[in-house]
Amino acid sequence: MPSTMQYRQLGKTGLKVSALSFGAWVTFGKQIGDPVARKLLHTAYDAGINFFDNAESYADGKAEVVMGAILKKSGWRRGSYLVSSKVFFGGEGDRPNEDGLSRKHMVEACHDALRRLQVDYLDLYYCHRPDPTVPIEESCRAMHDLIVQGKVLYWGTSEWSAAQIEAAHAVCDRLHLHHPVVEQPEYNLFHRARVEKEYAPLYRSPGLGTTIWSPLASGLLTGKYNKAVPKGARLDTPGMEWLRDAILKKPGIEKKVAAVAKLAAIAKSLGTSLPRLGIAWCLRNPNISTVILGASKVEQLTENLGALDVIEKLTPQVMRDLDAISGPLAD
């Protein structure tokens, strides 16, 4: 585990976020039991992580319930950590108006998240996907009102295009509303174009922050899927068949598996592990505010926290070598 956590500014906001953060997707309320979840959250906090990521749809709301119970009993000062939720896919119900980005669902989902997480406000609240069925003015105003009411401090988006983010800013400018300040996109050695190219103008103005997910390509960059999906792995989790097929049945997967072996060789030459290398590579991008880690075991989380010590080993030549291997296969 690294001796000192690094902290970065979230875009152009005044919020400081740990370079590594911890997310509840897949694991909390589903893949692991509550005692393990508690150990993971405490391990993360003790290592200096101050941002815990969640969403209404994670285990249909159960992930927030588990996290909320741990936070409530932790004794941690509320000012010492950040917690998020996301709205779009729905959580506990599946009736009309229980998903999407309508004003009604966004407000109800916020109230539900506050109840499940047992907090008085959300530090970050994301529109989990764009909703083409709802006027963007409605969604922007709903976020603005939640901020004015003190239920949300900052709002952002997840997997929105640059054009959609710019459209939201234009609406907020015109209506004098609080702007989105952060985007949560997928980012790893094999998935790079949106973060590195499409969003590039947004880092300068309006000053977009990023809280990236899937730094290890849902496990592909650990090397554990080179032969088959091991028992207990994320892609072996019930309900994750869609993700397993999206990764392992995608055209060109054989070339990526071969590339992973080459990346592992570079990691070995640097005296580190492939997961640490993959995470450190993400952190080398100055436009990344934080890398969200997921883990089902304390040992796994501790291992990945060591990525902070690998950053200094990623010299310009090493970065070129990594790019030569992964770049041609990245989307």
Language model: regions and residue ranges:
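Acidic (Asp/Glu)-rich catalytic clusters
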Residues: 11-14, 70-79, 115-118, 147, ...
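N-terminal small/glycine-rich loop or linker at the start of catalytic domains
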Residues: 12-28, 84-97, 121, 126
